[in-house]
Amino acid sequence: MAVFTAVTEAQLADWMRHYDLGEVVEFRGITSGIENSNFFLTTTRGEYVLTIFEKLTAQQLPFYLDLMRHLASHRVPVPDPMPRDDGALFGMLNGKPATIVTKLDGAPELAPGAAHCVEVGQMLARLHLAGRDFAHHQPNLRSLPWWQETVPSIAPFLSDARRTLLTEELAHQQAFFASADYASLPGGPCHCDLFRDNVLFAHAAPGTHHEVELGGFFDFYFAGCDKWLFDVAVTVNDWCVDLATGKLDEARVEAMLRAYQTVRPFTPAEARHWGDMLRAGAYRFWVSRLYDFHMPRAAELLKPHDPGHFERILRERLAGAAL
């Protein structure tokens, strides 16, 4: 279980004086937090989530919160940070930066079908287009430079076969990233972590033609500016796979890509390099999971994710399983 930063009633009351959100009705911790301390907050004005950032600093937060605010203003269903009385989107609570955002409706769908993939694909394309005029730029902090920095530190922990795969794929990605085709790929703000547990689905309204209804995307704290195709590949590698084998499910892949491209069609270069980007998306999470597994942070109480899952996905993509 995650360790939370406790908030007393007196601290909450003092904190809420800086917001025009009404009176507090209910306040309770969310025990599933991993990176941050999260609390459900109900007031006389509505339902919100209060987040205390355990790792991100006050200097790092503006990109993420401003991006969420920008997307919400463009009718992309994301948590909308609430401004304080001084206009800031966060303040300090118990010595740590904290924010209040709107609460999305729905629950994650951990066994998605094609209908869920359609909704996610369409909204991801809308998110990409909505971010085109976002004023700030921050690169995806878990892209090639981080891989190059991290691989030498984790390679000694691996078997010869895994170390060979790790270094050979890094060489392939370095060449891909240096190519003229890669430079031509369109991009902008990306979620970069749009897994099944970062999307909510609400019950479809009676009388609508939707089988499912998207509640929204959340957890933007790995977001960054990258090639849009990378964001699509990361999403497909989670939403459209058999979790036991890493194999792609053709029906779900087709549903997601067709839906995405009804909003933003791929360029010819994107179509040519879809397989390379599926590999890049798998590699990014294999590297980060290897790092978390073999080099855990001090006082980390959470069990790290299995690195083998994304190793299987990468090997599947290398074997030509990309559809």
Swiss-Prot record:
Pathway: Amino-acid biosynthesis; L-threonine biosynthesis; L-threonine from L-aspartate: step 4/5. It comes from the Bacteria. One of its GO terms (molecular function) is ATP binding. It is an enzyme of class 2 (transferase). It holds the Pfam family APH. The keyword Methyltransferase does not apply. Its EC number is 2.7.1.39. Keywords: Amino-acid biosynthesis, ATP-binding, Kinase, Nucleotide-binding, Threonine biosynthesis, Transferase. It catalyses: L-homoserine + ATP = O-phospho-L-homoserine + ADP + H(+). GO terms for biological process: threonine biosynthetic process. CDD domains: HomoserineK_II. HAMAP family: Homoser_kinase_2. Belongs to the pseudomonas-type ThrB family. This is Homoserine kinase. It comes from Paraburkholderia phymatum (strain DSM 17167 / CIP 108236 / LMG 21445 / STM815). The lineage of its organism: Bacteria, Pseudomonadati, Pseudomonadota, Betaproteobacteria, Burkholderiales.
